[in-house]
Amino acid sequence: IIGLELGQVYSTLGTDVSVVEYMPSLIPGADDDIAKPLIRKLKKHFKSIMLSSKVTNVDVGFKEGVRVSIESNNEIKDQVYDKVLVSIGRKPNTNLLSLENTDIKIDSKGFIIVDDYQKTSVKGVYAIGDIAGNPMLAHKATHEGKVAAEVCSGLPAAMDSKAIPSVVYTDPEVAWVGLTEKEAKDKGIEYELGDFPWAASGKAMILNASQGKTKVLFDPETKKVLGGGVVGPSA
């Protein structure tokens, strides 16, 4: 996602951008119909998009630029670029916290292990934010801080990771939260769907955002919202 966000910025500034994505889709976490308007626009912005592909080698000493070896369809080809932006994820910097001098437990990836109340393995010690595990999002860290503070104060609070919204700051913006329609189908969960195409909205037409849409999944009996997605300005 970071690669798409920054890639679109560079593309808008006039740079030819090629994207190499290991997964078979650019935004695997969102439903296809929510991601489709963005992907349609990115195909116009970017010089090329290589899905189900991976970078196997980068030669920064190549005199004509940066030579990148890309594997796709069991075939490796070399491409030469001026610059390479690596945006395959982040890792926690818990190695700088001297946790080996404490009884605080971390997982195999270096994240501090916490429960739904942000409690660590040491009584009275809480962890929030990027060091407490994925997703590494600012709004997730903020809410974790609130949960930890309320638990410390003796108030009933807990973290519900399913309620963490995901956001893609591209043009158009994409956001989704809770259960996606694909997840509901895969898990056999019954749902009803509220689907609103922005082409029916006068304001969306004024904003030149008629390709946007909003969808909400809800329980057919209780009418409880199970999830939702939006694509368009201010999603």
Regions found by a protein language model. Give the residues of each.
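Rossmann-like dinucleotide-binding cores of NAD(P)H-dependent redox enzymes
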Residues: 2-75, 135-142, 150-183
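FAD-site-proximal beta/loop scaffold in flavoenzymes
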Residues: 78-151
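Short loop/edge segments at beta-strand edges and connector loops
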Residues: 51-53, 108, 195
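Short acidic-glycine loop/turn motifs at beta-strand connectors
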Residues: 62, 108, 220-222
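A short alpha-helix-loop-beta-strand transition element characteristic
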Residues: 105-107, 155-163, 189-194
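Flexible, glycine-rich terminal cap/loop adjacent to redox cofactors
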Residues: 153, 170-235
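Short loop/turn motifs at secondary-structure junctions and domain boundaries
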Residues: 62, 96, 103-105, 206-212
